[in-house]
Amino acid sequence: TTTTGFSSTQYQNWPICSQMILFILSFIGGCAGSAGGGPKVIRIAVIFKLGGTSIRKRLHPNAVTRIKIGGDSLSSDTVSSIAGFIGLYLVTFAVGCFLISLTGKDLITVCSSCILTLGNIGIGLGGIGMDFSFSIYPDWAMWIFSFLMLVGRLELFTVFALFTRDFWRS
């Protein structure tokens, strides 16, 4: 499945484990610089390295650790910004899922719909797969999906900055 929703195979007929892998990959998104949505592979790599560094700091509290990508050390501000982005992405996904769950659809359909729109990807599971559409949702849910698509495509910090007082003051 592509970011345009074009699909070349009936992935909904695949085993559940394979569908789960697709769902997890939906959270990763494309590579840096790609048109695909999601947090991007580089941010996920930094988060995994941050997790490893945190474990090492627990074992060796006095150790000085650095997170490196491609041989270059990342500043603590950069790592903090990436962690904040991932946290905000997950909170946005969770709030979207909660709001869409009010439609009464099943959990797989709700979660798949939210990550599909937030990540701007084409993989829909449950009631919105290849043979189904978003017409199963009421009109108010479409507004939430539209917001998730906008946030996912324009980047979280950019859109949420519009809702801060500081943005409008300066």
List each model region and its residues:
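Membrane-proximal intracellular helices of multi-pass ion channels
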Residues: 1-170
